[in-house]
């Protein structure tokens, strides 16, 4: 083999090694981002489950004190029943937002009932649900950050080439609905 042929073979091998390195590095980075998104959603799901478990206690505590507001209590129960952790993430997010809206409606109605506002059990449950809502918001921010990083990564070169090869699609954000942007007062 001549020195020129050896040099050409080395150059081709080096270029192939660099291309392979870039592809593997980008593939691994995308896989890591996908895992972070899944973990971030799992963290949200834990808090959604905790809130899901607290809602019957809140409805039960309020039901006896608010005999005339069954529609609001029914809305909370319906929103709770609609949530299922086995659904795809976008549907889970929609049901989580519906539950948040129903709980906020309940808290707004509770404001009209002094006997409910002063009930210690209701106050404790409201504090716990508000704490969980705050945790959901924090974890939603982390989830959306990971989704942003992933979506940005798969839409830029050279990773977009891998994305088209492997069928990677942008992930949906867990976005706040307009009525969620401003928190209503919930002091009991």
Where is each model-derived feature located?
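A helix-centric hydrophobic-segment signal that preferentially recognizes long
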Residues: 2-188
């Amino acid at each position: 083999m001549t020195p020129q042929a050896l040099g050409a073979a080395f150059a081709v091998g080096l270029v192939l090694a660099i291309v392979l390195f870039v592809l593997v590095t980008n593939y691994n980075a995308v896989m890591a981002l996908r895992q972070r998104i899944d973990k971030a959603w799992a963290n949200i799901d834990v808090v959604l489950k905790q809130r899901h478990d607290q809602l019957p206690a809140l409805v039960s505590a309020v039901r006896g004190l608010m005999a005339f507001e069954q529609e609001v209590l029914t809305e909370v129960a319906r929103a709770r029943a609609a949530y299922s952790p086995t659904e795809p993430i976008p549907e889970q997010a929609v049901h989580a937002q519906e539950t948040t809206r129903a709980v906020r409606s309940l808290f707004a109605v509770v404001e009209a009932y002094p006997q409910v506002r002063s009930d210690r059990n209701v106050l404790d449950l409201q504090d716990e649900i508000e704490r969980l809502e705050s945790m959901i918001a924090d974890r939603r921010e982390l989830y959306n950050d990971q989704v942003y990083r992933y979506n940005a990564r798969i839409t830029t070169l050279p990773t977009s080439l891998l994305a088209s090869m492997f069928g990677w699609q942008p992930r949906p954000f867990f976005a706040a609905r307009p009525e969620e942007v401003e928190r209503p007062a919930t002091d009991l």
